[in-house]
Swiss-Prot record:
Its main location: membrane. It comes from the Eukaryota. The lineage of its organism: Eukaryota, Fungi, Dikarya, Ascomycota, Saccharomycotina. Disulfide bonds: none annotated. A motif (Microbody targeting signal) lies at residues 711-713. This is Peroxisomal biogenesis factor 8. Interacts with PEX5 (via N-terminus). It is found in: Peroxisome membrane. Keywords: Membrane, Peroxisome. GO terms for cellular component: peroxisomal membrane. Disruption phenotype: Leads to a peroxisomal-deficient phenotype with the absence of peroxisomes and the accumulation of aberrant peroxisomal structures resembling 'membranous ghosts'. It comes from Komagataella phaffii (strain GS115 / ATCC 20864) (Yeast). Transmembrane segments: none annotated.
Length: 713
């Protein structure tokens, strides 16, 4: 079917005679009488289309269709040789278009993968592969200046390796195939070096094509090759420009998909197909990581390049956060997918930048550059946090590494920068749009998280004049722009509580810029009103676990061995009395509204309890705090949790109060059993670290509880 006709043989003859490397176009023969009597074959027509394509000729489509069907190696080599002379793609390096030439890479990935699946009955795959490789090697040999033509083809071939492995790991003639893989990788590296040594990188589109090709074939490019390339070309800036500012990438956030609510998933796929840098954001970020790691040039110069790159990324993030105010919940519209890729790429780049400081053996550079880089990266995360808030960071450890490293960098080397960031972020939030803007809420949440990290070590001015007033307004629902009854503010409300709890630990701080007496006095004044607030907001706004954490944190601040206890011992007594009185007076309301058929009504006596339990096969034992059904029981449990901290002189008194006044009076049988068990756990836990107090508790239990229930001892 695919034996050469007259035109094909003429072309093959010209190629074999070396005409393929000349500037003259190949001549199609067939004017003589004898030649005219021969019928051209399909391959002849294909070659004619390739050498003189019309504007609407889909050369790539023809290749993808015909390549796997060729029946002998000579035709495979001929088609490859001929394609390398196609004026649509390879007329001159100065007129290369990325959008036009990138499909070559995808085509050869498809061709090689498809051919591997249908190796028979046409040319076996290993021979097909060898023929393609031989043609590419011949092109390199006859004219080394054609290196730029080979790069996308070689990249496509290498991309197909994973697709082949997915089909069959150990095909026939695997040794020959592996040998061809190695030869292709070596040829690609030679072409990359020649490209950057020749000065062809001056062509923007061609250089972009090569950068994308290198990112796609990164697993097959050796470190030594990358180092040699870095001597010739500044990859750091080029990759950042390609990702964030080129029309083939994020285009300085000027992408219709980000502002047009009518787009759909088809538009997203089309966007990726038309913009190769967008399609390979992650690969480009890993290329950046590799080049930063291997760049052994001037440290000062490298860090300056990184600094410039971060400036560009920060500018992009600011524009992006202004462009997007609301994310559509319809995930099919592609905006979320694009933003997720943008975030991941940014984090990988930041991780690469920060990792360089762990490799530097120069404290001066670290001290000078790390705080500056950390400030810029945190500013970028501040602008992009709406993406993190939407998708979370579960399983994406690089984000945590970047965030915590930046925090440590500014706290350790430049605390003033950390404080400046808090002020900048706080003033950079559009509070009036918090209700409607997911981006604005995410910025506030990010700022609160940062406040939590530094509130107990920052200056008194920042803490007392900005942070504490802001979070107090939030938790007390006094901020006009935040309504805690609106579920969209739930995470902000909870984060504000976390900042206050962290603020209470300032009394344990030994930082020089903390006025000890001022802060101890302030905490002493605020801690009991805050305890009352927490109790009142449970369970409508705070969960049972959040209540437990808050009360445990407060108790450690007011009981013995704490500065507050040394300052005023009465505060611990007030703490216990407030919590106990709430346990006495609070309604026995259910924490969760159960379906009508499963509603639990607190029975009036044990006899009714036993009847109910018997109908259900016996009482169901509660396993955790979350099993508690009433607000009263949850508060009693929280009170019991602080008993290990109570002074020795008051310890048994409070055990008796909890048991007789609260636990015994609990109407629901299973909850009563749970609270009694929790009290016992408290006694045993106390004994582990304070035997004197623990012994008192055990003796108390033996005398008071064992006589009324199953003996623990």
């Amino acid at each position: 079917m695919y034996r050469l006709g007259s035109q094909g043989r003429s072309i093959q003859s010209q190629l074999q005679n070396g005409d393929s490397s000349s500037g003259r176009p190949l001549q199609l023969q067939g004017t003589g009488m004898r030649e005219a009597q021969r019928i051209p074959q399909q391959l002849d027509y294909l070659l004619a289309e390739i050498i003189s394509p019309n504007e609407d000729t889909n050369v790539i489509g023809y290749l993808a269709y015909y390549y796997p069907k060729l029946k002998n190696e000579q035709n495979v080599a001929l088609l490859t040789d001929f394609f390398l002379r196609c004026p649509t793609y390879f007329s001159h390096s100065n007129v290369v278009s990325l959008r036009n030439n990138y499909p070559v890479m995808e085509a050869f990935n498809y061709i090689m993968t498809t051919k591997f699946k249908v190796s028979q009955p046409t040319v076996p795959f290993y021979r097909f592969y060898a023929a393609v490789l031989a043609s590419l090697l011949n092109c390199e040999k006859t004219d080394p200046s054609h290196h730029w033509k080979l790069i996308p083809i070689l990249t496509g071939v290498l991309l197909s390796i994973k697709g082949r492995d997915d089909v069959e790991l150990y095909p026939d003639h695997s040794r020959s195939i592996k040998g061809s893989d190695t030869a292709v990788a070596q040829l690609l590296q030679r072409c990359l070096l020649r490209f950057y040594q020749s000065g062809d990188a001056r062509s923007y589109d061609l250089n972009a094509l090569v950068i994308i090709s290198m990112s796609c074939a990164l697993d097959y490019v050796e470190d030594d090759t990358i180092k040699k390339i870095l001597y010739c070309f500044n990859y750091t800036r080029a990759i950042i420009d390609l990702i964030y500012y080129s029309p083939y990438g994020l285009n300085d956030s000027d992408i219709p998909l980000l502002s047009d609510s009518s787009v759909n998933s088809q538009s997203f796929d089309q966007l990726l197909n038309n913009n190769p840098a967008l399609k390979h954001l992650n690969r480009l970020s890993f290329l950046f990581e590799r080049t930063v790691k291997l760049n052994d040039g001037s440290i000062q110069s490298n860090l300056n390049d990184i600094d410039i790159s971060l400036n560009k990324m920060q500018s992009f993030s600011e524009k992006l956060s202004k462009k997007i105010s609301v994310l559509d919940d319809d995930s099919s519209k592609g905006v979320g997918q694009l933003l997720r890729q943008c975030l991941y790429a940014s984090i990988i780049i930041h991780q690469a930048i920060l990792t360089t400081f762990f490799q530097l053996d120069n404290a001066d550079y670290t001290k000078y550059f790390l705080p500056s880089f950390s400030r810029k990266i945190l500013s970028i995360l501040f602008n992009l946090f709406f993406i993190v808030d939407r998708i979370g960071t579960g399983g994406f450890q690089p984000y945590n590494f970047v965030y915590l490293t930046c925090l440590q960098g500014i706290i350790q080397y430049d605390m003033k920068t950390a404080e400046s960031l808090v002020k900048t972020f706080t003033t950079g939030i559009n509070y009036s749009s918090l209700k409607d803007s997911e981006v604005a809420r995410a910025k506030l949440l990010f700022t609160l998280n940062l406040m939590e990290q530094i509130v107990n070590i920052c200056s008194d001015d920042l803490r007392l004049e900005l942070i504490v007033p802001l979070v107090e307004d939030l938790v007390n629902n006094k901020n006009a722009c935040v309504d805690i009854h609106n579920h969209v503010f739930k995470s902000i409300f909870e984060s504000a509580h976390s900042v206050i709890l962290k603020f209470f630990t300032v009394v344990d701080s030994s930082v020089k810029n903390v006025d000890y007496e001022t802060n101890v006095t302030l905490v002493s004044e605020k801690i009991i009103p805050y305890l009352t607030l927490v109790i009142d907001q449970f369970p409508e706004f705070l969960s049972i676990n959040q209540l437990d954490i808050a009360i445990e944190t407060i108790s450690r601040t007011v009981f013995p061995d704490s500065p507050i206890y040394s300052y005023d011992k009465n505060i611990s007594s007030m703490f216990l009395n407030v919590l106990f009185n709430k346990c006495l007076t609070v309604d026995n309301d259910e924490l969760v509204e159960l379906p009508a058929i499963e509603a639990v009504v607190a029975p009036k006596n044990d006899e009714e309890n036993n009847t109910s339990d018997a109908q259900d096969g016996g009482p169901k034992e509660l396993q955790s705090l979350n099993d508690l059904k009433s607000r009263r029981s949850a508060l009693i449990s929280a009170l019991i949790s602080v008993f290990p901290l109570i002074p020795v002189k008051d310890y048994t008194k409070w055990l008796s109060i909890a048991f007789y006044d609260l636990i015994v009076a609990t109407p629901e049988r299973t909850e009563r059993a749970f609270l009694q068990e929790r009290l016992w756990d408290c006694v045993v836990g106390t004994n582990k670290y304070d035997p004197q107090k623990g012994n008192l508790g055990i003796m108390w239990w033996y005398e008071n509880v064992n006589a009324q229930s199953t003996a623990k001892l």
